[in-house]
């Protein structure tokens, strides 16, 4: 990832840092239009997720999370930007003529060869079941349910680690720090997701944030009492409570939101940090 630093020619470009290396020219048979409805609203039109709305129109890229082209080698043809995720994607041309997008593994370059199957080398970008991987392997795009496709460790720079295998299950340490059990028959991709420097980007101006579909964030302490529990007071006043709360009065900053009784609790050996 090449970070391009803007010159301070205008206030909006001061200290800006963007990635100017990867472009987007998707294949027409691997994209389709999508209507992003809601913008943070529920079925009643009430805001349930704040600071969302607007943004540039997007085309969805069909990503192959299943990697079910077994024992057929594929070659990386392009590395492209995807507006629907912070990781890059790469176009794969398989030997049987199939063309698919996958998540870009860190370090992969155009011309590299990848393959998926049961008896494939443990090398970057190859996909295989957890039972065929040695302990300590760095992996991403991990299946939870067999055949459903990868659901874990798909963000830019994400990587999990295979730390144990016992019985029918494998123990993984996920990017969040959570340690959980996964069926050994589930598949994963070797290596780390690319674009690890995504957190080094500096948009530099509010307009760039709006293009991404993110609206301005207003602090509750500067609102009126009718709008937020932190609002009101004369001048710059404290929040007036022992602990900060959400606009609806619930505890904020660290409250556990996971259901107390969930079916997957038995698979989690250690909660996330």
Curated annotation (Swiss-Prot):
Disordered: region residues: 1-23, 224-273
Localization annotation: Plastid, Chloroplast
Pfam families per UniProt: Ribosomal_L2, Ribosomal_L2_C
Record key words, sorted: Chloroplast, Plastid, Ribonucleoprotein, Ribosomal protein
Quaternary context: Part of the 50S ribosomal subunit.
Gene3D superfamilies xref list: 2.30.30.30, Nucleic acid-binding proteins (2.40.50.140), Ribosomal protein L2, domain 3 (4.10.950.10)
GO MF annotation: an example: RNA binding
Keyword match Amino-acid biosynthesis: no
Annotated protein name in UniProt: Large ribosomal subunit protein uL2cz/uL2cy
Keyword match Ribosomal protein: yes
Major site of localization recorded for this protein: plastid
HAMAP family: Ribosomal_uL2_B (MF_01320_B)
Gene Ontology cellular component annotations, sorted alphabetically: chloroplast; mitochondrial large ribosomal subunit
Family membership noted in the UniProt record: Belongs to the universal ribosomal protein uL2 family.
Organism of derivation: Amborella trichopoda
Family annotation (NCBIfam families): rplB_bact
A Gene Ontology BP annotation from the UniProt entry: mitochondrial translation
């Amino acid at each position: 990832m090449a970070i391009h630093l803007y010159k301070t020619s205008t206030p909006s470009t001061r200290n800006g840092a963007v990635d100017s290396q990867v472009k987007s020219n998707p294949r027409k048979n691997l994209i389709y239009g999508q209507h992003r409805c809601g913008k943070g609203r529920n079925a009643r039109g009430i805001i349930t997720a704040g600071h969302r709305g607007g943004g540039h129109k997007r085309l969805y890229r069909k990503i192959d999370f299943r990697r079910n082209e077994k024992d057929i080698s594929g070659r990386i043809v392009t590395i492209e930007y995807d507006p629907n995720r912070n990781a890059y994607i790469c176009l794969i041309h398989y030997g049987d003529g199939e063309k698919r997008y996958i998540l870009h593994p860190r370090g992969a370059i155009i011309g590299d060869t990848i393959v998926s199957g049961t008896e494939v080398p443990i090398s970057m970008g190859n996909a295989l079941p957890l039972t065929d991987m040695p302990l300590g392997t760095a992996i991403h795009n991990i299946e939870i349910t067999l055949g459903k496709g990868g659901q874990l460790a798909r963000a830019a720079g994400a990587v999990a680690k295979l730390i144990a295998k016992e019985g029918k299950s494998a123990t993984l340490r996920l990017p969040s720090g959570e340690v959980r059990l996964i069926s050994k028959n589930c598949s994963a991709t070797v290596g780390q997701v690319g674009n690890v420097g995504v957190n080094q980007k500096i948009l530099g101006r509010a307009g760039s944030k709006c293009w991404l579909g993110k609206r301005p964030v207003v602090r509750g302490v500067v609102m009126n009492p009718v709008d937020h529990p932190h609002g009101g007071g004369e001048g710059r006043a404290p929040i007036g409570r022992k602990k900060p709360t959400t606009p609806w009065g619930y505890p904020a900053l660290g409250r556990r939101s996971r259901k107390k009784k969930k079916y997957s609790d038995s698979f989690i050996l250690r909660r996330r940090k």
